[in-house]
Amino acid sequence: MSHQRAGHNSHFDSGTAATVFIPPDEPDYKLPETNEEFVKKMAKGAKTPITPHEIQELHVDAAPRIFVQNVHTVLRMLVNASGFGLKTYEHQDSPVFEHPLVSEALPTGLAYALDQFILHTCKIDESTYDGNEQWLNELFRQLRLDTDEEKEKTGQERTIIWSGDQLTTSRLRGLKALRSMDDTPYEQLCWMEPIFGWFHLQMSFATSLHKQYYGTKAGVGFARAFELLGKKGLGSAKVKGNWFHDFEETLEEVATAHFLSIWLEITGASSIQDLRSKSPEELHHFAECIVLEFASTAALEEESRRPPTERDELQEQIIQLNRDLLEYLELDNAIKQGHVSRMEDLLPSLLYRFQGGNNKLYAIEIMELLQKLHKEWTDNVK
């Protein structure tokens, strides 16, 4: 954090804060009575790393489910458009417009509400291994879990999911590795399972899209969109301020504009309102065609196989941008809805994006999560 001191001298300092979430006493949130089974499964799974072939199999397996979600997104863009007027559409209650079923979602309702406790902020630099160790000790002091008896109980019985940004997660994994040969389960940090926060991952995804598709004011990228929409301050990705919020809004606006124009192109309609004459089933069919022909890897590959004299590089760029915009919107909606299975389906493609985009840090985070989900975690920890 930065702030002004007397004499107008700028001063930089570091601090750490944390929030404790306690799940309700419900079967869906039950962790094992002891962490012995969890530790054994982790140790066994670590000996069998997930392979590239297995990751690609997960990617292929998830593709049909992601396609269904993308079709629904494109369909909702149409019916939610002001020109369509869903509330007065004859078939507004059609099941075609309902959200596709998902296999795994977080339970909702008052019975599943989490208790939340904000801890005191401390002047500790969490960016270092030493700082993370200091913070662990301070946190357990605040929670009154720093007695020998409580430490023993934590080491043998408790499993604590520790979520943070990429740097925090990386430091905690490194700290666990450094202390893996210590004497007790508590000192070895066997009770702690670090996991990255999805909000930070989503910000990295948005930054990756900005870097890849910024382009020029004369092209089809974001630079031209910013100019047309009158967006200011989005030219370079920033961590501070409201850049992410403003850029995410622009992503949604650009995606909506792209796909509404495709609706008109593929149906031959002169306006969005004209599509009210179509049945829900017809609209759903058109949405499938839009995703397949204008926003899929298959469409991109088909374009790339054309003879050099027939290739349309501009069309290829638009198809790729549309595909990646849908992927971002899918991740955003899955997180907001608590649809865990949809988030998990996106992990392989997120890995490919971060690895290909030279974001090695989040590529490692995705690899770690895939390894834990498919090799190391017990079912109740998942």
What positions do the PLM features span?
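Buried hydrophobic core signal strongest for RNase H-like alpha/beta domains in large
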Residues: 1-382
